[in-house]
């Protein structure tokens, strides 16, 4: 995409009250999200610290995986990164550049049985251009969170329009729109921190934000501010969650043909190489016997290696990528695991969303029974605050937070989830480079999160190469831990 040279001022009131009302959360426990006429939202709350957007530009990077990553019944062998740069300015004339990057992850964000990989990726690129233009044309001053809240309905409208224009067999889903918009949102947060010379995580209190959390999350949050649910200084260390894809080799004997690129090629080798203590296990969800044998096999090999290394504590998370037909499948699986390997069962820390992402359509898939055994976290369905409330109603006890859903939405959901005492974890979307720095930064600043997933190092290490010397504590993992103490640079910290 090209940089925009000339822009027109948006027409007064171009976002109607009807559009805003359609964007309101469904739950009566949540307040409407900035349901005010656009010409009053910022006029009534404009502050000297607010930013105006001068420019937004985008470009792409393409990478091939060193080995395929299988999840949700599909194998992924490539990735496209969307990089976003912005220029912002304060009323006093100060300016700053911001940067955001995210893998487009169309197989996960826009799964389709009817459209090809290239077609869904093309739709996301078309949407990215519209989101870039919408954001670049926005002229009101504000905090990045308020700008995102105000523009999200426009992004969703653009997704619908592109779906019609491209005559897509399926409409671009909201999750896909969030992923596509996430590097734009990140760039604004990055620029906002830089223009004030502080970490972005020090800009979420009353000194920089016009509203308390009740404005976004409802009356239960009256008088509370976002920074009360965040750490202004990062944790010093985080455990690394290593993904074990459904087609990954467990033993060296499983390797069909060596890659010979100097990196590990089996789980046994990876545990030794990085000193891993946290494993995310991808399962099928539609083959109980296979899932059970896979789990038992991984647990046996992990136990053997950890005993050799003298490691006594490690944990697993389980991810069925929505493929379980019902909660009975999950409960049966957990009981069988407990029978076959009681010690392995005790190592299970949490379970990611096991059934279909459309919660409204599948209200029968409640998680109450499974959640009695282990925390069950909402993931693919978690696209808004009302989805969080519905997930709680259906028995989910945790929330998966992801930078790929946007810095603004993720921080607000993290606050709400903490209020409701939900289990929290931070996962990635095979995020390399700056997107991983962003993701790790989230995990390092959210209370209660002790680990972060980072699997680009396994599947697309070439995209990490330029970043290894700049952030060795993140990209060169030792003893299963990342060093995160220096994630307090201005902005989001990835690019100066």
List each language-model region with its residue ranges.
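Flexible C-terminal active-site loop/helix
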Residues: 429-496
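Conserved, mostly hydrophobic/aromatic
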Residues: 84, 93, 197, 351, ...
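Active-site mouth loops of central-metabolism enzymes
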Residues: 241-264
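Catalytic core of soluble alpha/beta enzymes
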Residues: 281-430, 435-436
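N-terminal secretory signal peptides and thylakoid transit peptides that target proteins
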Residues: 5-28
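Metal- or metallocofactor-binding catalytic centers and their adjacent structured scaffolds
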Residues: 96-207
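Short, Gly/Pro- and small/polar-rich lid/capping loops
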Residues: 44-85
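Short, acidic/polar
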Residues: 256-271, 383-390
């Amino acid at each position: 995409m090209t940089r925009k040279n000339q822009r027109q001022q948006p027409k007064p009131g171009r976002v109607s009250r009807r559009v805003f009302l359609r964007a309101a959360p469904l739950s009566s426990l949540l307040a409407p999200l900035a349901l005010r006429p656009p010409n009053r939202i910022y006029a009534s709350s404009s502050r000297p610290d607010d930013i105006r957007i001068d420019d937004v530009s985008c470009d792409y990077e393409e990478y091939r995986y060193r080995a395929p990553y299988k999840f949700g019944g599909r194998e992924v062998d490539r990735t496209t990164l969307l990089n976003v740069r912005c220029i912002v300015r304060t009323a006093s004339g100060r300016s700053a550049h911001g940067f955001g990057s995210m893998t487009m992850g169309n197989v996960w964000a826009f799964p389709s049985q009817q459209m090809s990989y290239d077609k869904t990726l093309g739709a996301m690129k078309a949407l990215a251009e519209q989101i870039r233009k919408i954001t670049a044309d926005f002229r009101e001053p504000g905090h990045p969170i308020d700008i995102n809240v105000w523009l999200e309905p426009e992004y969703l409208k653009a997704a619908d329009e592109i779906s019609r224009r491209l005559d897509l067999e399926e409409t671009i889903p909201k999750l896909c729109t969030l992923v596509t918009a996430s590097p734009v949102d990140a760039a604004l947060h990055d620029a906002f921190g830089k223009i004030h010379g502080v970490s972005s995580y020090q800009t979420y209190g009353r000194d920089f934000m016009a509203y308390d959390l009740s404005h976004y999350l409802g009356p239960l949050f009256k008088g509370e501010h976002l920074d009360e649910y965040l750490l202004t200084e990062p944790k010093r260390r985080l455990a690394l969650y290593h993904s074990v894809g459904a087609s990954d080799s467990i033993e060296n004997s499983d390797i069909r043909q060596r890659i010979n690129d100097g990196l590990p090629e089996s789980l046994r080798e990876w545990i030794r190489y990085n000193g891993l203590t946290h494993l995310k296990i991808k399962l099928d969800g539609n083959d109980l016997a296979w899932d059970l044998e896979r789990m038992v096999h991984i647990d046996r090999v992990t136990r053997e290696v950890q005993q050799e290394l003298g490691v006594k504590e490690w944990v697993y998370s389980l991810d069925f990528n929505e493929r379980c037909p019902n909660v009975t499948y999950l409960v049966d699986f957990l009981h069988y695991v407990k029978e076959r390997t009681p010690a392995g069962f005790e190592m299970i820390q949490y379970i990611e969303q096991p059934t279909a992402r459309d919660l409204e359509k599948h209200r029968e898939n409640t998680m109450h029974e499974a959640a009695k055994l282990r925390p069950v976290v909402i993931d693919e369905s978690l696209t808004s605050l009302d989805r969080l409330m519905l997930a709680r109603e259906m028995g989910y006890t945790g929330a998966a937070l992801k930078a790929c859903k946007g810095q603004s939405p993720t921080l607000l959901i993290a606050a709400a989830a903490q209020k409701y005492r939900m289990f929290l974890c931070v996962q990635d979307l095979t995020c390399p480079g700056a997107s991983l720095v962003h993701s790790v930064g989230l995990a390092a600043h959210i209370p209660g999160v002790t680990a972060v997933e980072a699997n680009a190092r396994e599947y697309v290490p070439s995209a990490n190469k330029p970043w290894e010397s700049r952030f060795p504590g993140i990209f060169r993992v030792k003893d299963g831990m990342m060093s995160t103490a220096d994630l307090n640079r201005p902005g989001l910290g990835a690019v100066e």
